[in-house]
Amino acid sequence: DLRKKISPIIKDIKTLKEIIVVNKDNRFEDPLVDNDLDYEALMKDVSADSFKLVNTSQYDFSIMHYTSGSTGKPKGVLHRHQAVVQQMLTGHWALELSHGDIYFCTADPGWVTGTSYGMIAPWTNGVTQIIYEGGFSASSWYEIIQKYKVDVWYTAPTAIRLLMRSGEDVV
């Protein structure tokens, strides 16, 4: 689905060198287009020592998130490596994450919350994290919380309202 969204703008991106498509579980019959590279094929015979470590500073860019586009075209926002320190501290202070916790964040990793508080904050605080693939599902979420004995659960107010509407039958 995401590959289809970028097709119309590829010709306008002068600095684009390659497109690597990840299709681990083969959800799509033919996800590759034109000169796309297949991630699984590229990684098939690669060993860990094949990769060269690149030194970066705290001021180098680490990740780009796109805004939702609710006020115009989505914009790419660059985050620096230094932001990891703030995400670690926020995870510790606001979410009270600590070693030994089992953490479940329902935010999509494609959004800033899913990356910052779904992945980076728990990693840097040394907690076990659960990443769920899929949209809202009251029964699946409750099952995850019970099965994995989740200590800290992070979700959006909208999701809480949806859970409340689901009723007690799914609990």
Model regions and ranges:
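Structural core segment of the AMP-binding/adenylate-forming
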Residues: 1-41, 146, 156, 168
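Short beta-strand->loop structural element characteristic of the AMP-binding/adenylate-forming
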Residues: 1-8, 75-78, 105, 128-135
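Short hydrophobic/charged patches on amphipathic alpha-helices used for structural packing
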Residues: 7, 53, 138-142
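Conserved pre-ATP/AMP-binding loop-to-beta segment of ANL
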Residues: 20-21, 35-36, 40, 44-66, ...
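Conserved phosphate-binding and hydrolysis motifs of nucleotide-dependent enzymes
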Residues: 68-72, 76, 81
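Alpha-helix/helix-capping structural signal
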Residues: 82, 158-161
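Conserved AMP-binding/adenylation subdomain of ANL enzymes
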Residues: 85-105, 109-152, 165-166
